[in-house]
Amino acid sequence: RKPATLRMIGLLPIVRNKAFDMVSDGHEFKVWIPGKNRFVIGRNDAPLTVSKQPLENMRPQDIYDALLIPVIDAQNEIAVVENGYETVLDSRRHRVEQPDYELVVVRRGQKNWFLSRRIVFSRTDMKPHRQLIYNEDGQVRTEAHYEKYTDYDSVSFPAQVVITRPIEGYDITLGMVKLEINKPLTNDQFELEQPAGADVVHLGQEIGGLAAAAGASPQRR
């Protein structure tokens, strides 16, 4: 829900048990991991601390930015279109170089301007098929692939989105079974209560609005 509210529930393959449940208001987030009995609370802008448990590394805002490509921020970003090439497989599974258009986005950082995003458009359909998001050190934070574009209520959207987070060591493949756009949503659809007896983990020290509902003694990272 605009501007940056997200609720996502992940299911395990085959058994279809809940792997995680996450919610974010764009600033703070909560993630419930039933298999580990962990309830993680933090801010989307908290410094990254990589956990050995990949599910604990998930941040709703990272998924949101990969799933819905952000618009160019005219105040803090400069975008330039370049001609480029990407390696694809042809009908015979041979690797070939295919020309594309690449939207290079440079962003104002804390100290200097840096390469923030690279969005790759196919010359065949003029749709974005790949997005690379970088941190200020030049590392790839997110790589997203958008495939199988389909019309949903006259809106073209990829039926498959693959999101990879190489630093944290996890990836998510989203397959659209059903997509409803611009449907009314209620506030309770974005509420995630702390389960009784859950092991609570607070990321960072400053916890505000979303975390107020979690009343257990937290662990901190």
Indicate where each model-derived feature is located.
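Residue-level marker of positions within ordered structural domains that often coincide
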Residues: 13, 67-68, 72, 181, ...
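Short beta-strands and strand-coil junctions in structured, solvent-facing domains, enriched
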Residues: 15-18, 73-74, 152, 169
